Design a protein with these regions (language model features):
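Secretory targeting and sorting signals
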Residues: 1-21
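Cell-envelope/extracellular polymer assembly enzymes that use nucleotide-activated donors
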Residues: 17-294
Length: 294
């Protein structure tokens, strides 16, 4: 993708298309995944796109993560170490930025920045022995290979647990297909006449409000909106951005046109994606079985 500021603008296209942690999981979704069938999830754009059907929901990811921690606890017990898995966090809908800003409240509070409350939670403090065996060398290459005469898994008990749960439910080919569709449909959608017209209408609306931008991606490239504290100017710009999207119907037009592209792309890879979906269901079922055993 051609971007002026790749790290920032990647939030648009890569929301919902890159793997969380590892593509070996067979999941094309990113950090902003669908939560459940909640009204919040239904109201988003990313999670209503056709390709979202081939991703885990946040609730499913939470089950998988909880199961991995349960397996890690069993592994830790073999080293006579007590590990208490973190309590599961109820999935919360996160900002949907595939098409840039779309939430008036977030724009008014944080401008073009992410809501600080959506930052990853810090892991609980663990004592040195527990931490060394739980994470192994993936966190600290100097960690000893053994603990009290027993070999520590190279990536620790948690890494081993993740590997054990993942190995039977990996579909990298399907995950690659889903990720490719999500990326390509986004890029191609911006070239469609309907979306281009939407950009022009949005740009004209922004011009009336005193802001000169050709596309909704442009404000994210502004240095002043990426560094330092959020200013009133940034909040005002972000508010106008969202307001103009609503007035011109850009969000719905963009979503509709990209959905058409994805539907056609999915039809060409139907078998691959069906297998990916089956693998997802099997892995979630396995995770829930682990949790049921306690």
């Amino acid at each position: 993708m051609k971007r002026l500021v790749p790290a920032m603008l990647a939030m648009f296209a890569l929301v919902g298309c890159t793997a969380q942690g590892s593509q070996d999981d067979g999941d094309p979704a990113g950090s902003n995944r669908p939560t459940t069938d909640s009204e919040a999830a239904k109201g988003s754009y990313t999670y209503r796109l056709p390709i979202a059907a081939y991703s885990y929901t946040d609730a499913e990811y939470a089950s998988i993560a909880a199961a991995e921690h349960m397996l890690a606890r069993t592994c830790m017990a073999r080293f006579s170490l007590t590990y208490q898995p973190p309590p599961p966090n109820p999935p919360q809908p996160s900002a949907d930025r595939r098409y840039g800003l779309s939430d008036e409240k977030s724009a008014a509070l944080f401008g073009y920045r992410m809501d600080p409350s959506e930052a990853p939670k810090q892991p609980p403090q663990l004592d040195a022995d527990v931490r060394a065996v739980l994470y192994g060398k993936r966190e600290d290459a100097s960690v000893p290979a053994e603990y009290q005469g027993q070999k520590v898994p190279e990536n620790g008990c948690l890494g081993q647990a993740q590997s054990d749960l993942r190995k039977d439910y990996s579909d990298p080919e399907g995950a690659e297909a889903a990720s490719r569709i999500s990326s390509q449909s986004y890029e191609q959608s911006m070239q469609l006449p309907e979306v281009q017209a939407g950009f022009r209408n949005w740009s004209a609306c922004m011009q009336k409000n005193g802001y000169t931008y050709a596309s909704p991606r442009d404000p994210f490239a502004a240095q002043e909106f990426r560094e330092g504290p959020v200013t009133e100017r940034e909040k005002a710009t972000a508010g106008a951005d969202v307001s103009c999207k609503r007035r011109t119907g850009l969000l719905d037009v963009w979503f509709t046109e990209e959905s058409k592209l994805q539907t056609a792309m999915i039809a060409k890879d139907r078998q691959l994606l069906q297998k990916l979906q089956d693998v997802h269901r099997q892995k979630v079922a396995a995770a829930k079985a682990i949790l049921a055993k306690g």
